[in-house]
């Protein structure tokens, strides 16, 4: 992945966190991106960022926008998805919960399918370890999801 894409993802997440913490209307709009039936109401935000709302990147950005709206702070987390799942299940005797969720994610063939699998996973992570997941890393991973060399 190019540095410009990484920079764009990082900048996007930082701006979404910053702006949604200051603007309740924007926060409400970003939350709509989580639901496929209402995500089109958040598309103007994506269009301003130059995201093709008819392309596969739209799903990655919508998922991360909706999660950013649920963050309480203005800073991105530091944990990768795997690390966050491991922390969620740290007190369990087995790590089967985390590993089964990751295995299910690995079987996904598209960003759209990954989005459906990730939504409940991300809700669990946000409820157990709030604001610790690195959204910019998640966005970068989802953007390159369909490229064979990255899987």
Model-predicted segments: where are they?
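Basic, alpha-helical nucleic-acid-binding regions used in initiation and control of genome expression
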Residues: 2, 8-66, 71-151
């Amino acid at each position: 992945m190019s540095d410009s894409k990484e920079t764009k993802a990082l900048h996007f997440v930082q701006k979404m966190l910053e702006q949604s913490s200051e603007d309740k209307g924007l926060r409400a709009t970003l939350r709509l991106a989580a639901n496929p039936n209402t995500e089109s109401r958040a598309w103007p935000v994506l269009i301003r960022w130059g995201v093709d709302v008819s392309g596969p990147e739209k799903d990655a950005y919508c998922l991360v926008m909706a999660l950013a709206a649920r963050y309480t702070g203005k800073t991105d987390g530091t944990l990768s998805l795997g690390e966050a799942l491991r922390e969620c299940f740290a007190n369990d005797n087995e790590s089967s919960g985390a590993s089964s969720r990751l295995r299910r994610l690995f079987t996904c063939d598209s960003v759209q399918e990954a989005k459906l699998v990730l939504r409940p996973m991300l809700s669990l992570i946000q409820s157990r370890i709030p604001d610790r997941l690195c959204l910019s890393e998640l966005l970068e991973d989802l953007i390159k999801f369909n490229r064979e060399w990255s899987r």
